[in-house]
């Protein structure tokens, strides 16, 4: 066990985690040059296209160190984006140390900070590494000082490397062996293994990625899942080199996979503990705290025949993505679907894209909302995640909106723009500290404003240099209203939205104007209205298409023309009373883009 090292790589988006992990795999000979491709561990198409890591992946490598010993390095690549922080905390729970990778040109960013503090709270050894020293903009000395100032760990001797060119990679490996402590565990005791991740394989059932804390697990053991009490015989055990390599046994301190032919999708929940039936551990390992969804949106299949497939797809996806929450919902406009909870907007986009790609579904999404706390006049307190579930306005005593604490790191020259943006988003400044050229700001901003487009606008006002990390702190009373959209005097529940009263009128006006361009014209006028309760705050009309019924009258008597026009008018009136309007998917998405063009 003294030769095992378990570690993760934590870093901000685009600081070179995946490239560094490629280089480590290559150096230790995990894959031959022919099999090597860039971003080996980003196995999903979406990860490659967007250039981001979404899922944590694990690899076991053998490293022949300079002291003549061979070390087993188990490392877990983690995502850097703020929406996938939950994946990071799970990966860190399985490790004794973490490599903190910082771009020597960009310096410390907010997400680096957040993940680094998570690692420190778990008492992990944090090893700083300055990456991308081959870039002309790199300034490793300044960045090393930044790490000391902002994070407070000693970075004077930090390894300087370039994952792209391979410079300094052997130093990184030596540093891992030297600084990160070996795991401690009892080899002979009862088995305790933590499930870091699970996914569903059509042939093998549930595949679980586990970290064995105590004891050992081998093929043929009767494995018991502690939360459900289910017992299954172990079929395969091994680790990833990144390819699956069967070893038949995993001992304390090791990270690998276990397949026990579990066909039930919820058979091995993430964060659970595995033990062996008959020689059981006394208690389960402390799991992870569940990530609470911050954003909710309705997902509906375009054709109602896909509902069953959609339900199965969500079940399979949720085993792999433990932070996804869903429950059935039905809408008068869109039929049956699910209300899903996500960690943020990027998470929502990724989930929708994975469902459409991997399961071949066609989906409509409604506008995302956050959870509001509503106190009714009867004194009940409700948590509401959908505008459709809001009680009538006169039954509401008080609405409280969730407030997020946002930590923003921004270079001094963009400070003014960022402060202006935070004020527009109804933010309250609580702290501001200067660290060299960087400024650390802390704001309390309503979660509803943060999840809509705050991240995008923060990036554009600061030319991409500002970085953001946020978490929920409290509910606070606010003057919120529900804006309903009426099409031909009928409410469309899927388009309702909750917003602050001060912005509601301009919001309603923008929305109906935008929808006017998206709804196809009919043979009769379509009235689009935005309303708060029974008060109409904005209106716009989709003009009718008119057929020229007088085309075949040459000259002739005026009464003949009047008769034809009257007949047309009656026909339109009848049509309007029975005609219904199809709303295209773009109209539902229009809600997301209000205010972006300003």
From Swiss-Prot:
Chief place of localization: membrane
One Pfam family it belongs to: EFG_C
Compartments, as annotated in UniProt: Cell inner membrane
Taxonomy, superkingdom: Bacteria
One example of a Gene Ontology biological process annotation: positive regulation of translation
GO CC entries: plasma membrane
EC id: 3.6.5.n1
Residues noted as binding GTP in the record, renumbered to the chain: 14-19, 131-134
Keywords, comma-separated and alphabetical: Cell inner membrane, Cell membrane, GTP-binding, Hydrolase, Membrane, Nucleotide-binding, Protein biosynthesis
UniProt similarity note: Belongs to the TRAFAC class translation factor GTPase superfamily. Classic translation factor GTPase family. LepA subfamily.
UniProt-recorded name of the protein: Elongation factor 4
């Amino acid at each position: 066990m003294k030769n095992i090292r378990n570690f993760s790589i934590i870093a901000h988006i685009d600081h070179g985690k995946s490239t560094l992990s490629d280089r480590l795999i290559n150096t230790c000979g995990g894959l031959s040059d022919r099999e090597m491709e860039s971003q080996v561990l980003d196995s999903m198409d979406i990860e490659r296209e967007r250039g981001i890591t979404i899922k944590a992946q694990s690899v076991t490598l053998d490293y022949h160190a300079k002291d003549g010993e061979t070390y087993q390095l188990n490392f877990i690549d983690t995502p850097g984006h703020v929406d996938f922080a939950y994946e990071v905390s799970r990966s860190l729970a399985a490790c004794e140390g973490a490599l903190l990778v910082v771009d020597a040109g960009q310096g410390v960013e907010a997400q680096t900070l957040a993940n680094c503090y998570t690692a420190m709270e778990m008492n992990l050894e944090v090893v700083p590494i300055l990456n991308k020293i081959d870039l002309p903009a790199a300034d490793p000395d300044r960045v090393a000082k930044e790490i000391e100032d902002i994070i407070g760990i000693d970075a004077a001797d930090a390894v300087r490397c370039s994952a792209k060119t391979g410079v300094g990679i052997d130093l990184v490996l030596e540093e891992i062996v030297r600084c990160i402590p070996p795991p401690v565990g009892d080899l002979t005791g009862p088995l305790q293994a933590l499930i870091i991740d699970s996914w569903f394989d059509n042939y093998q059932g549930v595949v679980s990625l586990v970290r064995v804390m105590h004891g050992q697990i081998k093929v043929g053991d009767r494995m018991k899942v502690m939360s459900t009490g289910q017992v299954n015989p172990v079929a395969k055990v091994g680790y990833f080199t990144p390819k699956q390599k069967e070893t038949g046994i995993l001992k304390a301190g090791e990270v690998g996979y276990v397949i026990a032919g579990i066909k039930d999708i919820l058979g091995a929940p993430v964060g659970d503990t595995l033990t062996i039936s008959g020689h059981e551990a006394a208690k389960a390992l402390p799991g992870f705290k569940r990530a609470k969804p911050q954003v909710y949106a309705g997902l509906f299949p375009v054709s109602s025949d896909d509902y069953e497939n959609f339900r199965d797809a969500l079940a399979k996806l949720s085993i792999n993505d433990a932070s996804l929450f869903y429950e059935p919902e039905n809408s008068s406009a869109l039929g049956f679907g699910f209300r899903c909870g996500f960690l943020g907007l990027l998470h929502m986009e990724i989930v929708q894209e994975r469902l459409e790609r991997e399961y071949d579904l066609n989906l409509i999404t409604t506008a995302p909302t956050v959870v509001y706390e509503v106190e009714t006049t009867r004194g009940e307190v409700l948590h509401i995640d959908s505008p459709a579930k809001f009680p009538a306005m006169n039954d509401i005593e008080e609405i409280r909106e969730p407030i997020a604490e946002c930590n923003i790191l921004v270079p001094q020259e963009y400070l003014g723009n960022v402060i202006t943006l935070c004020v527009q988003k109804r933010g309250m400044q609580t702290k501001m500290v200067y660290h060299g050229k960087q400024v650390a700001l802390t704001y309390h901003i309503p979660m509803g404003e943060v999840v809509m487009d705050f991240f995008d606008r923060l990036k554009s006002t600061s030319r991409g240099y500002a970085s953001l990390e946020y978490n929920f702190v409290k509910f606070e009373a606010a003057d919120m209203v529900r804006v309903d959209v009426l099409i031909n005097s009928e409410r469309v529940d899927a388009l309702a939205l909750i917003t602050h009263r001060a912005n509601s009128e301009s919001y309603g006006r923008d929305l109906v104007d935008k929808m006017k361009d998206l709804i196809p014209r009919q043979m009769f006028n379509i009235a689009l209205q935005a309303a708060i309760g029974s008060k109409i705050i904005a209106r716009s009309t989709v003009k009718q298409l008119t057929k020229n019924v007088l085309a075949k009258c040459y000259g002739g008597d005026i009464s003949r023309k009047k008769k034809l026009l009257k007949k047309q008018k009656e026909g339109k009136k009848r049509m309007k009373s029975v005609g219904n309007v199809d709303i295209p998917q773009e109209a539902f998405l229009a809600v997301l883009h209000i205010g972006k063009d300003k």
